[in-house]
Amino acid sequence: MVVQNSADAGDMRAGVQLEPFLHQVGGHMSVMKYDEHTVCKPLVSREQRFYESLPLAMKRFTPQYKGTVTVHLWKDSTGHLSLVANPVKESQEPFKVSTESAAVAIWQTLQQTTGSNGSDCTLAQWPHAQLARSPKESPAKALLRSEPHLNTPAFSLVEDTNGNQVERKSFNPWGLQCHQAHLTRLCSEYPENKRHRFLLLENVVSQYTHPCVLDLKMGTRQHGDDASEEKKARHMRKCAQSTSACLGVRICGMQVYQTDKKYFLCKDKYYGRKLSVEGFRQALYQFLHNGSHLRRELLEPILHQLRALLSVIRSQSSYRFYSSSLLVIYDGQEPPERAPGSPHPHEAPQAAHGSSPGGLTKVDIRMIDFAHTTYKGYWNEHTTYDGPDPGYIFGLENLIRILQDIQEGE
């Protein structure tokens, strides 16, 4: 939706009204939908620098970087608040002196207030169906209009860790929770005409009908070199109490399409923090299960890409991907049954990103969230490292091993 920018009197440039990204399954920072193939998130200069100096070998495993936009609050005639994005003019301040978005400061405050008080409502089910909306209205806009508050009852089930039914919602609650918390703080702490810088990134799930997404926090260490002692201790405690310490990886969120009941099964980071090693293995199994059967044909292409990523990470000397995540993505919509004598749908050659040799089923493996990534050559870096990231490699090796066990039926 294009709107007129009301941030400055006399400055009536066209803008894009942002929508919540309904397939966000983890993270604190609100991710917004810019268009069908693009999402945006508050700009962190370290992350922007990473994307702009990205090693060529890593590009296939990261979202495409599409630049930046400025974002401001916009109020429509009914008083409804939303975020509107405008392209950044070339004449604006250069990259090297850009400051952190005020939106990032709000996100960091949100981390402090929600970091340890997670809800026990860790499993949600939401139907992937059309909400009641006008022909030109997207599902995200209809959702915001029909459910303006987080605790508004709707259609789908949310359970606690004991399986008790406690709440019903019509959407994956995590992305909207991040969006509404972010919007509330922006509204209360900054004027309407305050401009914030956002990154534009590829929407890596846009090509999927029913995107199944697993968000994995990688590595044995999650705090950046610039973390305060309090934050460092908090992150070290989370790692020690989760599979991050013993496996180098933990679940930060996931959604899995259940074909039998036509809804997404959703779990959040609080669920992931409580898992044992065996619980982590069972969660990976569940991520590959559609409610009817295990999607075994996904295992080989996922393993193929993870091994390729492992090879790339081993070649990236000095890089430390602290607090970054790894997305595993596939389509919950299975290919149609083949006719007798026709090629198997999983054997058809694919040229799209994420395809594997031999025409393996389409999957995507993408690294995201580089706000705390460090490497030699980063501007004004005080701490540098030698060799590849041992914690990330440890996590990838264990992830591959567990998926191999599932593949072999153990």
Curated annotation (Swiss-Prot):
Keyword Transferase part of the UniProt annotation: yes
Annotated region (Disordered), positions in chain: 333-358
Gene (UniProt): IP6K3
Gene Ontology MF annotations: ATP binding; diphosphoinositol pentakisphosphate kinase activity; diphosphoinositol tetrakisphosphate kinase activity; inositol 5-diphosphate pentakisphosphate 5-kinase activity; inositol hexakisphosphate 5-kinase activity; inositol hexakisphosphate 6-kinase activity; inositol hexakisphosphate kinase activity; inositol-1,3,4,5,6-pentakisphosphate kinase activity
Subcellular location: Cytoplasm
The organism of origin for this protein: Homo sapiens
GO BP: any one term: inositol phosphate metabolic process
Catalysed reactions listed for this entry: 1D-myo-inositol hexakisphosphate + ATP = 5-diphospho-1D-myo-inositol 1,2,3,4,6-pentakisphosphate + ADP; 1-diphospho-1D-myo-inositol 2,3,4,5,6-pentakisphosphate + ATP + H(+) = 1,5-bis(diphospho)-1D-myo-inositol 2,3,4,6-tetrakisphosphate + ADP
Protein name: Inositol hexakisphosphate kinase 3
Disulfide bond residue pairs: none
